[in-house]
């Protein structure tokens, strides 16, 4: 009986340690490419490594990296506060966003570590309520 209980116990531990399938990625550009993307909730997101507002390749990407994160206040986030992880695979950058609000920049890099292109990630829960006034008019 002790042996059976031990086997069941070990089996439960092994099952608990199994990795679940990764959270599916939400593509950020289903219709058009961009240089800035709005993320309104935590999750896994992806976008193609093309130059903003076009379909031209940014070059031979081998890695992706978060260059900086900001809450837009006088408080500085620690690394990973907004973007938990970022990677490059098969022409796409994939990242995991937290539920915090702010801004981040993700860069595509070549084999020498040179930045080929970067994208602004704007993390807000109210993108439809944002307005920016300038001499050219109002941007919403």
Regions found by a protein language model. Give the residues of each.
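C-terminal edge beta-strand
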Residues: 113-130
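A short beta-strand micro-motif common to beta-rich folds, especially ectodomain repeats
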Residues: 101-111
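Bacterial signal peptide processing site
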Residues: 19-21
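Sec-dependent signal peptide recognition
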Residues: 2-9
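Extracellular/luminal low-complexity segments enriched in Ser/Thr/Pro
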Residues: 88-101
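Extracellular structured ligand-interaction cores
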Residues: 92, 103-105, 116-118, 139
């Amino acid at each position: 009986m002790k042996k059976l209980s031990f086997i069941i116990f070990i089996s439960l531990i092994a099952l608990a340690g199994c990795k679940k399938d990764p959270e599916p990625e939400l593509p950020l550009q289903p219709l058009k490419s961009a240089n800035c993307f709005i993320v309104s909730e935590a999750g896994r997101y992806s976008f193609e490594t093309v130059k903003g507002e076009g379909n031209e390749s940014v070059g031979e990407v081998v890695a992706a990296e978060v260059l900086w994160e900001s809450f837009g206040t006088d408080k500085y986030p620690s690394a990973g506060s907004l973007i938990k992880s970022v990677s490059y695979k098969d022409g796409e950058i994939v990242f995991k966003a937290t539920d915090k609000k702010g801004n981040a920049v993700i860069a595509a890099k070549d084999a020498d570590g040179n930045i080929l292109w970067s994208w602004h990630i704007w993390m807000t829960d109210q993108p439809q309520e944002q307005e920016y006034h300038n001499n050219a008019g109002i941007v919403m």
